[in-house]
A protein has these predicted regions:
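ATP-binding N-terminal substructure of ATP-dependent carboxylate-amine bond-forming enzymes
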Residues: 1-99
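Phosphate-binding site of ATP-dependent enzymes
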Residues: 163-212
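Glycine-rich phosphate-binding loop signature in dinucleotide/nucleotide-binding domains
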Residues: 64-70, 143-145, 178
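Short loop/helix-cap segments at secondary-structure boundaries that form the rim of catalytic
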Residues: 37-43, 141-144, 173-177
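Short acidic-hydrophobic, aromatic-tinged amphipathic segments that line or gate anion-handling sites
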Residues: 46-52, 128-133, 163-166
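ATP-grasp fold ATP-binding core
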Residues: 119-120, 141-161, 179-190, 209-211
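Glycine-/Pro-rich loop/turn segments that contact NAD(P) or position catalytic residues
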Residues: 96, 104-132, 138-144
Length: 212
């Protein structure tokens, strides 16, 4: 099996683990926009490609998939998930399976406020989240939330821009200076537990899960 890992970046250990799991039967190909990205050197073969915002990016990845007879393609950065999801059919036509969420799921997961709305509508307990200052003011006046709070980009990743806010003036400055922030209740010293769930791409059923 040949798997293409897009935007490999610094995730050398991840590719190394995949290599060990796949054994001699597997072939790993990686791409990145920089030849200095360490993870590409864990692959059997690599390509230096344009950035994901480049108009030629998608056609470049499709061309690599055709040339290398890639069985499956995935990405190691969040912003690229939507791109692959939107063009799933184009990859399927050349015999390449896209290993990422479907477009509808990707839209929900990549937008933190949309995710909050989805969880709330489905009665799944989650962190209180506000998409703008006005809705936060209403909740604050009602005593539903208090300081400190936590702000982060609505569509950000890698904890970039995420930080604790201790009072109203600081919050107003943050929201005015960075459009697109959301406001969340501060979880304090709560224990952070990540849960990974693996879904079979054919049956769409969960096959394994573990916490870390």
């Amino acid at each position: 099996m040949k798997i293409l890992f897009c935007s490999a970046g610094r995730r050398a250990e991840l590719l190394k683990d995949f290599r060990n799991s796949m054994g001699a039967e597997g072939c790993i190909i990686a791409t990145d926009m920089s030849e200095t990205a360490p993870a590409i050197y864990m692959a059997d073969k690599y390509y230096v490609v344009p950035g994901i915002e480049d108009p030629e990016y998608l056609s470049t990845i499709l061309e690599i998939c055709q040339k290398e007879n890639i069985d499956a393609v995935t990405t190691l950065i969040d912003p690229e998930i939507m791109l692959l999801a939107m063009h799933r059919d184009e990859f399927k036509r050349i015999g390449t399976e896209v290993l990422c969420p479907f477009e509808e799921t990707a839209k929900i997961c990549f937008d933190k406020f949309t995710m909050f709305q989805y969880l709330t509508e489905n009665r799944i307990q989650t962190v209180l989240t506000y998409g703008d200052l006005d809705s936060f003011f209403v909740a604050y006046d009602r005593g539903e939330i208090t300081f400190p709070v936590f702000v982060k980009p609505r569509t950000g990743s890698g904890s970039v821009g995420a930080r604790k806010i201790t009072d109203m003036p600081e919050l107003q400055r943050a929201m005015e200076g960075e459009p697109g922030l959301i406001i969340q209740e501060y979880m304090g010293d709560a224990v952070d537990i990540d849960v990974d769930i693996y879904i079979d791409t054919i049956s769409h059923q969960p096959v394994s899960l573990f916490s870390k």
